[in-house]
C-alpha cells in the first residue's frame, strides 16, 4: 500500500484460470474458517440458512461456492450452525452436489427425496434459537431468498421453528464487507493490474488527438481486458472536459489537444473488484505541462479525499463521515461532492454509503456502521474554476481504492496526485 501511485505501472503477471481457481478456493476456505464464526457471534445467530436456485443465485451464496462449482445447481442450500460451547461452526449443504469439500453433504435423496423435508429435519435436530434467512427490505445483499423458496422453506418447518426466523441482512453484509489478511495480501496487486490497464488507455498508444474518440478509448479497455482474460463489472466511462464547453463530452466526441480526459474504470479479478477514476491532460503543441488551474483542481480533489479518509472512525455511520468530510472540505474553501462506497465482492459493495452524487444529505443507505477490515472506494468530485479557461468551473472527478484497518485509511496502490500527460503528436 502507498500514498502516491506509480505513473504508468507495468502490467503485473496474470494467473492462468487453473491457478486463479487455486487462489480463489484458498481464500474461500480461509474466509469460511475465519469470517463465518465471527459473523454468527456478532449477530447472535446460531443458524444461517441460504438458498439459491440455478440461474438465480443469492448474492451471498455466489461468493461461497468454490471455483469449480461456480453456480448453484437445481437448488443449492447452505447451512451454518454454531453449536456453542467453543465447538466449531458446522458447514452443511443440503443439495445433490458436493461443493469442493468446503461443506459437509447433509442430504441423501434416496432416504428422503424431498429436499425441504430433509432441510427441516436437519434444522429440527439442531433446534436453533435464531434462524437467519436472507430476507431484507433494506439491502439487496441480504434479500437473496426468493418469495417461492421462502414460502416453501417456512412451510416445511414446525410452527415453533418458524417463530425463530430472523433476517439475514446483518450476517450477509458482514460476510461480504469483511476482508481477510489473505485477501489484503492480494488486493493491492489486483488494483495495480487495473491501474496498469487504465494507464495504457491514457497514453499516446491509444489516444491520437484529432482522431480518437472517447468511445474508442472505452472500447479499448473492453478489448484489452478480454485479451488479458480479465473481467470488468461495468462498461468503462470516458469523457472530456474542454475549454468553453460547460458539460462533459463523451460518446463520439473526438479528443483534441487541450482536453482533460476523465475515465471511470474497474475490473474483477480473483472475485474482487476495483473502481478507479483518473484524469489525463492532452498537451497542446508546444506545451510541456498542464495548465496550473487544472493541476490545482486535482489538488483540491486530493484535499477532499483527505477530508473523507480523515473522518473514518469505527462504529460511526456513513452519513457521519459524509457530514464531517463535507464540513472539513468546505471550511477549507473547497466545493465538494462526496459519493464514496464499500468495495469487495461487489463494485458497489455491502456496507454503508458515504453520500451520493445526487444527494449530499443524510440517506437511509448511509445509516450502517463503519467496521474495520473493510475496503472502500473513495469517490468524489471537487468543483473548481480554471483561470486559464476563463474561470470556467470544472468537475474534477476522482476515485481511489483504500483499506480501513480500524485506525487509518490506506490506499491500496496509491492515489493520483498529478495529471497524466498525453502528447499531442
Predicted regions and their residues:
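Active-site neighborhoods and metal-handling regions in enzymes and metal-associated proteins
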Residues: 2-425
Amino acid at each position: 500500500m502507498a500514498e502516491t501511485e506509480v505513473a504508468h505501472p507495468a502490467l503485473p503477471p496474470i494467473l492462468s484460470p487453473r491457478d486463479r481457481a487455486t487462489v480463489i478456493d484458498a481464500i474461500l476456505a480461509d474466509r469460511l474458517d475465519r469470517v463465518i464464526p465471527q459473523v454468527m457471534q456478532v449477530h447472535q445467530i446460531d443458524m444461517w440458512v441460504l438458498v439459491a436456485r440455478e440461474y438465480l443465485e443469492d448474492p451471498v451464496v455466489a461468493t461461497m461456492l468454490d471455483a469449480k462449482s461456480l453456480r448453484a445447481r437445481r437448488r443449492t442450500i447452505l447451512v451454518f450452525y454454531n453449536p456453542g460451547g467453543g465447538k466449531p461452526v458446522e458447514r452443511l449443504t443440503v443439495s445433490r452436489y458436493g461443493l469442493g469439500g468446503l461443506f459437509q453433504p447433509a442430504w441423501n435423496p434416496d432416504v428422503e427425496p424431498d429436499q425441504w423435508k430433509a432441510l427441516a429435519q436437519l434444522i429440527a435436530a439442531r433446534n436453533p434459537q435464531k434462524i437467519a434467512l436472507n430476507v431484507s427490505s433494506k439491502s439487496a445483499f441480504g434479500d437473496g431468498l426468493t418469495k417461492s423458496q421462502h414460502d416453501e422453506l417456512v412451510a416445511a418447518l414446525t410452527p415453533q421453528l418458524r417463530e425463530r426466523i430472523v433476517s439475514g441482512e446483518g450476517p450477509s453484509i458482514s460476510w461480504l464487507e469483511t476482508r481477510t489478511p489473505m485477501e489484503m495480501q492480494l488486493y493491492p496487486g489486483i488494483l495495480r493490474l487495473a491501474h496498469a490497464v487504465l494507464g495504457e488507455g491514457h497514453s499516446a498508444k491509444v489516444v491520437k488527438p484529432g482522431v480518437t474518440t472517447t468511445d474508442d478509448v472505452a472500447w479499448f479497455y473492453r478489448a484489452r481486458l478480454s485479451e488479458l482474460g480479465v473481467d470488468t463489472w461495468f462498461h468503462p466511462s470516458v469523457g472530456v472536459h474542454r475549454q468553453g464547453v460547460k458539460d462533459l463530452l463523451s460518446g463520439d466526441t473526438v479528443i483534441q489537444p487541450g482536453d482533460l480526459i476523465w475515465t471511470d474504470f474497474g475490473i474483477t479479478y480473483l472475485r474482487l473488484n476495483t473502481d478507479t477514476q483518473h484524469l489525463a491532460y492532452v498537451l497542446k503543441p508546444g506545451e510541456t505541462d498542464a495548465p496550473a488551474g487544472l493541476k490545482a483542481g486535482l489538488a483540491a480533489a486530493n484535499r477532499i479525499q483527505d477530508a473523507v479518509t480523515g473522518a473514518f472512525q469505527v462504529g460511526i455511520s456513513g452519513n457521519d463521515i459524509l457530514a464531517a468530510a463535507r464540513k472539513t472540505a468546505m471550511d477549507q474553501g473547497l466545493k465538494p461532492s462526496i459519493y464514496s462506497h464499500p468495495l469487495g465482492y461487489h463494485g458497489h459493495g455491502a456496507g454503508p454509503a458515504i453520500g451520493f452524487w445526487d444527494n449530499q444529505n443524510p440517506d437511509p443507505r448511509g445509516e450502517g456502521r463503519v467496521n474495520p477490515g473493510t475496503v472502500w472506494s473513495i469517490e468524489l468530485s471537487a468543483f473548481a474554476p480554471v483561470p486559464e479557461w476563463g474561470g470556467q468551473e470544472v468537475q474534477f472527478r476522482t476515485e481511489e481504492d483504500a483499506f480501513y484497518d480500524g485506525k487509518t485509511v490506506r490506499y491500496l496502490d496509491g492515489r493520483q496526485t498529478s495529471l497524466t500527460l498525453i502528447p499531442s503528436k
